[in-house]
Curated annotation (Swiss-Prot):
PANTHER family: BETA-PINACENE SYNTHASE-RELATED (PTHR35201:SF4), TERPENE SYNTHASE (PTHR35201). A motif (D(D/E)XX(D/E) motif) lies at residues 82-86. Its cofactor is Mg(2+). InterPro entries: Isoprenoid_synthase_dom_sf, Terpene_cyclase-like_2. Its EC number is 4.2.3.-, 4.2.3.125, 4.2.3.126, 4.2.3.15. The gene is TPS1. Gene3D superfamilies: Farnesyl Diphosphate Synthase. Keywords: Lyase, Magnesium, Metal-binding. This is Terpene synthase 1. The keyword Metal-binding applies. A motif (WxxxxxRY motif) lies at residues 309-316. One of its GO terms (biological process) is terpene biosynthetic process. It comes from Physarum polycephalum. Disulfide bonds: none annotated.
Length: 334
């Protein structure tokens, strides 16, 4: 039976990435570190932790143990940081304060200068985790240029993605679709994840390659594919948590749910076709070489890893979600 959200129609033209053979070792290391920091003490947080560790093993299938540990910890940090805005256990003032402190950390690469008095322990613990990630990035990155881009893309994610997305949630009306996509793409932290993949692969691509228009567009597509697909996978979960800021909900302002879903899936698949066309264009150009191949493969693995995780994790398990939702009419026609 096909999935009601038609996730089987979201297509990626690459083989499923195999799970990294260092998964078990890295999981053990991460569980110990998070226990040391006092993170992931609740059952739902442990479930999230285990899911993201699995996702990391698919995003970085060829990484060594230390590289996989770094890449997975960064993805975990992104999920934890996003929870500061999403979870009710953090107050509005706390989320703003946490964002400012984290921005300061990315700009200075040091702990925040302000005291932690009055902050939730979860925020303090998250800052300690980020400092561990900084140290690992410095040890693994192939040169200061890559580290600088890593910090800059993370800062960009917060200022132009996470904070504006949080503001959307407090608006009386949903944003326009184009406005939403521009912010949501950055909120997905795709650019930062791609630089993370560079660090994992020990790459140091020159600036003219990083800024080549086709490559810039491929990075953007990677981010767009991930977040628009996620808006499909997470649709029911967001309904349960009364979060209407989702591309499908915005499309449903003018279309039926099924038509909105069709448009969303078609858009995601069109982006992937564009990605492949750009890749083929680069392959036929004088720019193509092994490091660029590895770099692009990192983007493909990021999209595929997110897909594998989204279609298997309990977070988006449709049967479980429908079991707890009070709304039996899951597919309203408008």
């Amino acid at each position: 039976m096909n999935h009601p959200l038609r996730i089987h129609e979201i297509r990626l033209p690459w083989k499923h990435t195999p799970m990294n053979p260092h998964y078990a070792f890295v999981r053990e290391q991460i569980v110990a570190l998070l226990n040391e920091l006092g993170l992931c003490e609740e059952e739902k947080e442990k479930d999230r932790r285990d899911g993201v560790i699995t996702m990391g093993a698919y995003i970085y299938p060829d990484a060594g143990p230390n590289e996989l540990l770094f890449g997975t910890l960064f993805v975990l940090w992104l999920f934890f940081f996003d929870d500061i805005f999403d979870e009710s256990k953090f107050l509005k003032g706390e989320s703003s304060q946490a964002a400012e402190r984290t921005l300061q950390m990315f700009r200075t690469r040091q702990p925040p200068v302000n005291a932690t008095t009055g902050l939730s322990m979860g925020i303090v613990q998250l800052e300690k985790l980020l400092l561990r990630i900084f140290k690992m990035a410095k040890d693994l990155a192939h040169g200061p240029y890559v580290i600088s881009r890593f910090m800059e893309t993370c800062e960009f994610y917060i200022t132009e993605g996470a904070i504006p997305m949080d503001k959307f949630r407090f608006r009386k009306e949903l944003p326009k679709l184009d406005e939403y996509l521009a912010v949501r793409t950055i909120d997905g932290a795709g650019e930062a994840c791609i630089v993370c993949s560079e660090i994992v692969a020990h790459l140091a691509l020159p600036e003219h390659i990083i800024n080549e228009p086709r490559i810039k567009r491929m990075r953007e597509i990677t981010g767009q594919q991930i977040v628009y697909s996620n808006d499909i996978y997470s649709y029911h979960r967001e309904k349960i948590h009364n979060n209407s800021v989702n591309a499908l909900n915005i499309r449903c302002l003018t279309k039926s749910f099924n038509d909105a879903l069709t448009d969303q899936i078609n858009q995601v698949n069109e982006w992937v076709l564009e990605f492949e066309a750009l890749k083929n264009s680069l392959y036929e150009s004088t720019l193509w070489e092994n490091n660029l191949d590895v770099y692009i493969t990192g983007m493909e693995n990021t999209m595929m890893g997110c897909k594998i995780w989204s279609e298997s994790c309990t977070r988006y398990d449709l049967n479980a979600l429908l079991h707890i939702t009070p709304d039996k009419n899951e597919f309203p026609e408008r």
